[in-house]
Amino acid sequence: MSEVSKWPAINPFHWGYNGTVSHIVGENGSIKLHLKDNKEQVDFDEFANKYVPTLKNGAQFKLSPYLFTGILQTLYLGAADFSKKFPVFYGREIVKFSDGGVCTADWLIDSWKKDYEFDQSTTSFDKKKFDKDEKATHPEGWPRLQPRTRYLKDNELEELREVDLPLVVILHGLAGGSHEPIIRSLAENLSRSGRFQVVVLNTRGCARSKITTRNLFTAYHTMDIREFLQREKQRHPDRKLYAVGCSFGATMLANYLGEEGDKSPLSAAATLCNPWDLLLSAIRMSQDWWSRTLFSKNIAQFLTRTVQVNMGELGVPNGSLPDHPPTVKNPSFYMFTPENLIKAKSFKSTREFDEVYTAPALGFPNAMEYYKAASSINRVDTIRVPTLVINSRDDPVVGPDQPYSIVEKNPRILYCRTDLGGHLAYLDKDNNSWATKAIAEFFTKFDELVV
């Protein structure tokens, strides 16, 4: 593990709104990508320099002058009204897995803008017609959905399954889902060219979905990603698959990529603001006043609410013990007792949550040992898919101490370090995200040019 920087997340060297992209490439260079038309081979970093100008080494970008630190960028992303920004429509599918559990997949459906008479200038649409369709498709007992999201009809789902465009799967962060502004921004940018089919895979219990088995997601929870990608590959063996993870979703994606190695069906991947070293991030969140005060408690309380609303399925009596020795591969979720839920409501950090719930379920003695083992930095060297990595030096959640020395050893990773951007934000004066545009540009050029 790297040492924690002595600099606070806010410091004079990281103030400003003119950002710069820097490539972190190891001494062995980058993997060579094979281009379609001229049969040329080009290094991964040179591919970005030549074909993805937004991510060119030394490229500059301009953020909002009013959001001149990572703290302000991140706070604004979480607190401002983005209800009229990134107005995408989602059709929801309940995805069933081999262990009996479910999650939800929200498919971006651009054609619904026409069907529901969407007005781009006002973001208004035929809500009466939409609500009628939503009511007709909503499963009994399931939570009310976010705006512009409804369950798919059977015939609509069948039509989606016939689409054979390249697919981009988006994985959201720890306290989020498809409704998050940054996820909507990413989905909108990816779909704009019409080149991709886009879906957000909501983790179990997130984005107003239900948990149906006593199994809550962790950093090790890669099985749903694996099964979903395998399902999509089986349906259309010849189409390309891509994935992008944001924050904790980036951790799960990087862990999946490292576990799968050469077996992954993905053609390329991207991570945005991944806390590569969870232990380092946990220390940052506890030691840095801004991170501890403004972010850690909110995330812990979201996780607690997720447990609370799903106690019907997760709950066990007070005093419950594991029915088998818990391990990463065979966890035992015996900690979801009424007593622990009462305790959790006063948690002020994710570490407290993981100390009570996550670590015991996986057989770890404490949260810090869980963080140390579950960090995606442990699996970087076995990633075999070309992967774009974007992290910011002023990220108040991840901190400035990124694991360059380890990541740069893998030639399949293009590490784009930025000096500004905050956590998942990168907001410009119009509240658009530079990062989501950059990721969309990367996938578009990769799909267009690379074999």
Swiss-Prot record:
This is Medium-chain fatty acid ethyl ester synthase/esterase 2. Disulfide bonds: none annotated. InterPro entries: AB_hydrolase_1, AB_hydrolase_4_CS, AB_hydrolase_4_sf, AB_hydrolase_fold, ABHD4. SUPFAM superfamilies: alpha/beta-Hydrolases. Its EC number is 2.3.1.84, 3.1.1.-. The lineage of its organism: Eukaryota, Fungi, Dikarya, Ascomycota, Saccharomycotina. PANTHER family: ABHYDROLASE DOMAIN-CONTAINING PROTEIN, MEDIUM-CHAIN FATTY ACID ETHYL ESTER SYNTHASE_ESTERASE 1-RELATED. The keyword Acyltransferase applies. Keywords: Acyltransferase, Hydrolase, Isopeptide bond, Serine esterase, Transferase, Ubl conjugation. The active site is at S247 (charge relay system), D395 (charge relay system), H423 (charge relay system). There is a cross-link at K114 (Glycyl lysine isopeptide (Lys-Gly) (interchain with G-Cter in ubiquitin)). Belongs to the AB hydrolase superfamily. AB hydrolase 4 family. Residues 166-430 form the AB hydrolase-1 domain. It comes from the Eukaryota. It catalyses: an aliphatic alcohol + acetyl-CoA = an acetyl ester + CoA. GO terms for biological process: lipid metabolic process; medium-chain fatty acid biosynthetic process; medium-chain fatty acid catabolic process. It comes from Saccharomyces cerevisiae (strain ATCC 204508 / S288c). GO terms for cellular component: lipid droplet; mitochondrial outer membrane; mitochondrion. GO terms for molecular function: acetylesterase activity; alcohol O-acetyltransferase activity; monoacylglycerol lipase activity; serine hydrolase activity; short-chain carboxylesterase activity. Displays enzymatic activity both for medium-chain fatty acid (MCFA) ethyl ester synthesis and hydrolysis (esterase activity). MCFA are toxic for yeast and this enzyme could thus be involved in their detoxification by esterification. Present with 2550 molecules/cell in log phase SD medium.
